[in-house]
């Protein structure tokens, strides 16, 4: 016996956005785009700017599905996922465990490396240690362990006499730690997973005045150029796609995810940078672009995510 899917107008979707992380504005942009697209697809949508009263808000709203358009702390690290499990409201994207693991960059490296994904050496140090002297030979990158959108990333250039003071402003973990890893030169490549299918690859070229694919490059109009499909050798594309799918599965991700890599063309060296379980859904974001390249419109993508929503993720 087959069951008829409900009319979309009867499916009440609460789009969670905003919150109070460092990525609030990006989340608001993602959430607004997703909400508008879901309405155009025929769903009944409520926009929820997340605050500490979220449990009470959702209990009153009684949505059938929560579309998670949050980014950063609390929305991307397993916290809101755990709340939705407690409230028994199906939700999109990855679950509690995958979200919490993927948000911790160093733990992510440890896990995916066991599945053959190439990673760079990483050190966990306190800001005081990182400021006292170079903890590794420049060039290197100092970054938060649990932030996205390149928030707080500091590049220490080759020949730097001492660590820059900006390291002292990097957001720290509860253990007062940041992550330091070698600067990997080369091209920035990104690849996604939608469902269980790996996408094409984008070669990201940051605008000339930017050092790397930072917050401005990601979200400002003209901040970067996306070359899709990436003009790279077939053997490199195969490795990127294989490692992207391996990382997605190793962490137990669901829905969509996106992996970022650096490829040093001169050495033919590919290095995994990070995985994103809540990829941006703004007009300049990568997953919508990769979906469109595969023949999936933005409306179809968000509607598929709602259909894919579940508990026990």
Predicted regions and their residues:
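Phosphate-binding site of ATP-dependent enzymes
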Residues: 162-242, 269-271
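Short, flexible, mixed-charge acidic loops at enzyme active sites
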Residues: 80-85, 212-220, 277
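Conserved metal-phosphate-binding beta-hairpin within the catalytic cores
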Residues: 182, 248-283, 291
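Active-site nucleotide/adenylate-binding loops and adjacent lid/helix of ATP-dependent enzymes
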Residues: 2-17, 45, 58-60, 101-187
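Short beta-strand-to-turn element immediately C-terminal to the catalytic PLP-Schiff-base lysine
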Residues: 125, 153-159, 193-195, 273, ...
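ATP-binding N-terminal substructure of ATP-dependent carboxylate-amine bond-forming enzymes
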Residues: 1-97, 101-103, 107, 114, ...
């Amino acid at each position: 016996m087959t069951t008829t899917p409900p009319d979309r107008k009867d499916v009440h979707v609460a789009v969670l956005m905003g919150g109070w992380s460092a990525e609030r504005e990006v989340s608001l942009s993602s959430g607004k785009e997703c909400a508008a697209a879901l309405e155009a697809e025929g769903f009944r949508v409520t926009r929820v700017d997340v605050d500490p009263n979220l449990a009470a808000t959702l209990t009153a709203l009684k949505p059938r599905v929560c579309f998670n358009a949050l980014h950063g702390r609390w929305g991307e690290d397993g916290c809101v996922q755990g709340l939705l499990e407690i409230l028994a409201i199906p939700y999109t994207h990855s679950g509690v465990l995958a979200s919490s693991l993927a948000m911790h960059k160093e733990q992510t490296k440890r896990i995916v490396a066991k599945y053959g994904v190439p990673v760079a050496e990483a050190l966990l140090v306190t800001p005081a240690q990182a400021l006292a002297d170079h903890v590794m030979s420049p060039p290197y990158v100092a970054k938060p362990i649990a932030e996205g959108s390149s928030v707080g990333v500091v590049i220490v250039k080759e020949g730097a006499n001492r660590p820059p003071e900006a390291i002292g402003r990097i957001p720290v973990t509860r253990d007062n730690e940041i992550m330091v890893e070698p600067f990997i030169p080369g091209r920035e490549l990104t690849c996604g997973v939608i469902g269980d299918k790996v996408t094409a690859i984008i070669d990201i070229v940051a605008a000339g005045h930017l050092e790397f694919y930072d917050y401005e490059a990601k979200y400002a109009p003209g901040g970067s150029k996306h070359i899709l499909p990436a003009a790279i050798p077939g053997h490199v594309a195969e490795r990127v796609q294989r490692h992207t799918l391996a990382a997605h599965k190793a962490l137990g991700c669901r829905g969509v995810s996106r992996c970022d890599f650096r490829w040093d063309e001169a050495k033919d060296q590919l290095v995994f940078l990070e995985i994103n379980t809540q990829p941006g859904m703004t007009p300049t974001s990568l997953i919508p672009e990769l979906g469109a390249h595969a023949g999936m419109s933005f409306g179809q993508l968000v509607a598929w995510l709602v259909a894919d929503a579940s508990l026990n993720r």
